[in-house]
Amino acid sequence: MNKEEYSDISDSESEEVHETNNHNEHEHEEEDDTPEIVVPERKFLKEDEDYSVPFPVMRECLVLLLQSRRILRDMMYYRFKMDRFLSGNLSVFEIQNLLHSQREDKESDWIAEIQELKRNLVSEVRRNHTLERDLNRLDKRIALLIKNRGNIQDVLADKAGLKAPKHKGDQKKPELINDPKKLEAYQNLFYLLQTEPKYLAGLVYLIQPEQMESFLGTVILTLFGDAFTPREEFLLLSLYRLSIQKEMANIATVGDFLKADTVVPKMIITYNKRKQGTDYLKAVIGPILSNVIKQELNLELKPNLVYAAIISEQEIRTGEKSTLDRNVSHEKALEVPEVTKTIKARVDQLISICEQFLDGIISSLNRLPYGIRWICKQIYQIAEKNFTKSTQDEILKVIGYFIYYRFIQVAMVSPEEYDLVGREIHPTARKNLINVSKVLQALFNFAQFGSSEKHFIPLNGWITSHMGDIKNYLQEIIEVGEPEDYLQVDKYMELTQKTKPVIIISLPEICNTHQLISKNLDSLVAKGEKDDPMRIIMKELDEFGPPPDIAADDDREVQLTLSNKFQKTIEEELSPGESLLSQTKEMVISLLRALPTLPEQKDQSDEPPNLVDVLNKARQADPSLEPEIKKILDNLKKLEEYNLTTSADNYSSFLKAVALEVVNRAEIREQQKKEKQRLTTSLNNLRKHQKYLNEQIAQYNQYLQDCRLKHYQNKSKKKKKGDGAKVGPFKFSFSELHKKGVIVDSEVPQITRKKIKFVISSDTVGVFDVSAKMAGIDVQTMRLELDDLLELNSIGTTTLELDQITLDVNMTIHLLNKLFLY
């Protein structure tokens, strides 16, 4: 209704609303104080009934009331029915009806393909694990061979008197990680911290406030990297989601989230300091800042300070000392026309600059780092769920706090910290930026200036006019997809990495993290959970004693190649129970769709037939269904073994899962489509990784062969042929090898030992044939490989048991080196 319609009604209050041609002329002649009953158009009155008679009007109202009650009852029934549908609490009859109402579209169902992809994925994962083990073994053998070669060179240098003396400044491997097993334990520890957010999300609440900044630096900048990689970003965002959930579960109002002693805001501030955040500030805020600074403006708005500045300018211009009082009140200064004129001009300039920043911020929404936007989305969604009494504006204020006050404003008032301007900022320019930031802060806080900052009140109009823009901007910030889609990573991500993740971490960071976890282990992990991965790793580290105290200024860094000690848990995610559940649900859905419609229950007091009853009746009615139904019932029993359902409630939990799948069929199929795409991508990546591993193994084998050849080059030069030249043979008596410490034990009888000669030769690099001869006849032949001996040495094995004799590993290596390498 427009303005004219409102005025027509108010000018003639006695006019009747319903239009009738017979009474129009009489309605303006006189006013009657008797209240009239206004009735809507006639629907239920008879033609000969008069509106002035009360009973027909009452009957009309009763009919409308009854009609309203029926509509309300239908709405309540529909709401109840929808709640049941969405929760999956449907009977078999209702599920079947719903299936019959849906269009069967087999082409868009990818259950079978997804399960096949998962089976292939597990197969490829296992194959890749085998290849990775082979590759690691080759890598270790190469390292041991090189180390052995180095030891030989040291011996030769000692003999020739050429070995250089050690200098005081020579770097040694840090004692903290000088043991390979200890190093591996730390690599397992930091991998677990990186991939299981529950541990770090718990730790941040257990550290002392004075340790918070350094700990967050370790967590965010060291453990997850400063530069953007999808894997680290995905893991870090998982940590933030869990931390926000924990934080908001322990506060009373959404406003408490912004208090100084809460943890998550500090985490978010640290997150914003990463490369993505600083790159955004340099690209968006930096140019505007430079433009404002170079203008050499003065945006002081306090009237008394403006008044004092005008007096100073007059003194400089005239060269005469002013007799005016500089210390005047706010109100007194505003009585001076030049002050009000100056302030008005500065307000206009301030608004213009605020417009520049606001336009830059809003227009660069798509350049805002994804992680910051997604964290804001989590804050909004979790706050909306936890604090149902909070208004949308109250939640948006929290988003504005993190986006502006803790991110953009920090860079505006201290641009040199982010290297946004290439010059020193004059105090006046910095004060200008502070004034601009205050105005924008009020805008992002949906607030206006009051009596405490009266000089900013002229900006209130501009703030009010742009509040809608800011609300829209903050709402658009949280319109982002999930990390799985944006970053193209998922739970199969770890299976497709060509190289293990690596972090560069300082020794104090390793020690501090170790000490922090040791101190708070019982708070992080329940005492009864002895098989918890964190407890297992910490138990291994405890075997090496407590971490040493390392000075905070010790800047030595080490590279940790992170590894998963619990690799089997990844394959367990692709459990047969999950596959069987999906398969059985699909079988039940297909069967219910094919069966004739079940009769509807007439007596609502009776219990609806359960799934087992329906299946048994179906196979009695149609014996051809016996194999399929038997398979379903067998699967249900297996699912019960996996604790995925139970016969105690007649498999109602399974039926609920079937109902939810049918109700949400379209959404589930879309999820299946995405899952299929992800699995296909993961499988392709695994196969690419497999090709890469095979290539690496081939290169490592060649390199290992080259290393072996270098070991033999001195000896082989004495032969006419190089690679295939046979070196040796070398002959030793039993007593000689025993005296050298090579043979440490033997089951050979004493009387026979004197007659035995050992002949050692090599026609393949790194492989040694040892023949035991008696009276010139071979009694026994053994084959030793230097790689195997070096590996035994590396794991601390001191002896090697062969048939009837036991060799000392170290002395055997020494002998072979001396014979074939020196």
UniProtKB/Swiss-Prot annotation:
GO terms for biological process: actin cytoskeleton organization; cell motility; chemotaxis to cAMP; culmination involved in sorocarp development; epithelium-like organization; MAPK cascade; mitotic actomyosin contractile ring assembly actin filament organization; mitotic cytokinesis. Pfam families: RasGAP, RasGAP_C. PROSITE patterns: RAS_GTPASE_ACTIV_2. It is found in: Cytoplasm, Cell cortex; Cleavage furrow. Keywords: Coiled coil, Cytoplasm. Residues 234-477 form the Ras-GAP domain. SMART domains: RasGAP. GO terms for molecular function: actin filament binding; alpha-catenin binding; calmodulin binding; GTPase activator activity; protein kinase regulator activity; small GTPase binding. GO terms for cellular component: basal cortex; cell cortex; cell trailing edge; cleavage furrow; lateral part of motile cell; plasma membrane. Residues 15-27 have a biased composition (Basic and acidic residues). InterPro entries: RasGAP_C, RasGAP_dom, Rho_GTPase_activation_prot. Residues 1-36 are annotated as: Disordered. Residues 161-822 are annotated as: Required for interaction to rac1A. Residues 104-152 form a coiled coil. The keyword Coiled coil applies. Disruption phenotype: No change in cytokinesis as gapA can functionally replace this protein. Null cells project numerous filopodia, show increased cell motility during growth and form multi-tipped aggregates during development and show elevated levels of F-actin that is organized in large leading edges, membrane ruffles or numerous large filopods. rgaA lacks rasGAP activity in vitro. rgaA expression is inversely correlated with the speed of cell motility. Heterotetramer. Quaternary complex with activated rac1A, ctxA and ctxB. Interacts directly with rac1A and ctxA. Preferentially interacts with activated forms of rac1A, rac1B and rac1C. Interacts with racE. Part of signaling pathway that is required for completion of cytokinesis. gapA and rgaA control cortexillin localization to the cleavage furrow and hence may be involved in cleavage of the midbody in the final stage of cytokinesis by regulating the actin cytoskeleton. Forms a complex by linking activated rac1A to ctxA. Assembly of this complex is necessary for the recruitment of cortexillin to the midzone of a dividing cell. Overexpression leads to the suppression of the formation of cellular projections containing F-actin and to a defect in cytokinesis. This is Ras GTPase-activating-like protein rgaA. The gene is rgaA.
